[in-house]
């Protein structure tokens, strides 16, 4: 594995911290160990996030963020199951009152989430939403 290509055998190690840019293009950290991650690779999911996306990887505030508040986004904004690329289902532990309890690569298809996060999906997911209508 080098910095440009993750071998299929290494994919499971890295995929928890990757951003899907296109069907077969992911931005991944060069080191999969959590203690070595920094920046956007450390942002957790929330079903009531304070951030979303502009473009592919620019994280922006969706509302005022309080001092000390954890930065979060909804993984539905970036992750999608497509044919041979499958995002692992994840039990959600965000703890908000409207928690979905299970995060999947199909969440971007949810009409309520599409309305809630309009303008804050990655370009990749925005294009999938447009194609699905």
What do these predicted regions represent?
Residues 45-133:
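C-terminal SET catalytic tail plus cysteine-rich post-SET Zn-binding segment of SAM-dependent SET-domain
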Residues 1-52:
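Catalytic cores of histone-lysine modification enzymes
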């Amino acid at each position: 594995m080098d910095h440009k290509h993750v071998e299929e055998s290494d994919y499971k190690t890295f995929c928890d911290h990757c951003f899907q840019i296109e069907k077969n293009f992911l931005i991944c950290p060069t080191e999969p160990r959590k203690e070595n991650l920094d920046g956007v690779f450390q942002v957790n999911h929330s079903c009531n996030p304070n951030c979303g996306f502009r473009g592919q990887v620019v994280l922006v505030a969706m509302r005022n963020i309080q001092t000390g508040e954890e930065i979060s986004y909804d993984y539905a904004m970036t992750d999608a199951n497509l044919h041979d690329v499958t995002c692992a289902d994840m039990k959600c532990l965000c703890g908000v009152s409207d928690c979905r309890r299970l995060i999947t690569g199909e969440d971007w298809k949810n009409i309520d989430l599409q309305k809630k996060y309009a303008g804050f999906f990655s370009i990749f997911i925005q294009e999938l939403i447009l194609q699905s209508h």
